[in-house]
């Protein structure tokens, strides 16, 4: 593990984590380590990794972490990488629901797919799961930011683990990523 990944892994028991590190510094791999620990050792049922666009989903392809001394490998069933798959369950939103009802551990989808899944199925269906938000600076405290509103609901409910990853705290506009209460 890189130094940043080790620091993140040391905090793996926390319910909420923010990983702020420059691009190409290993945030995706750090999340793999965290996710595997949470779903294997912390009784977290599943991990849902959400990315802003489909091309970024490639960062979460299967990875042989054991080649580098880790105790497990990162695996995503191809039908649950909705950045590469059209969704085999009647569309991507229905595929999220099917994943939640499955025994599989990892799903990768876009921010948009996740937002629509939360709108369709509510926050309760995500209880006891890890929600990892890549490119977290896309979230905003602005009430018009749907992803930000959903994350606020998850935090208020307190029944999911959240890992937020970003290379920058700044959005390029005047909106705060989180409100002081969050």
Q: What do the PLM-derived regions correspond to, one by one?
A:
Residues 1-20:
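Conserved pre-motif I regulatory segment
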Residues 112-113, 122-164, 168-169:
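SF2 helicase catalytic motif II
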Residues 28-33, 38-39, 43-75, 113:
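Conserved Walker A/P-loop ATP-binding site and its immediately adjacent core
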Residues 57-62, 116-117, 141, 171-176:
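Switch/connector loops and helix/strand junctions flanking conserved nucleotide-binding motifs
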Residues 13-19, 45-46, 104-105:
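Pre-Walker A (Motif I) flank of P-loop NTPase domains
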Residues 14-34:
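Walker A/P-loop
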Residues 69-118:
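Inter-Walker segment of RecA-like/P-loop motor cores
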Residues 161, 173-182:
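Interdomain helical connector at the RecA1-RecA2 junction of SF1/SF2 helicase-like NTPases
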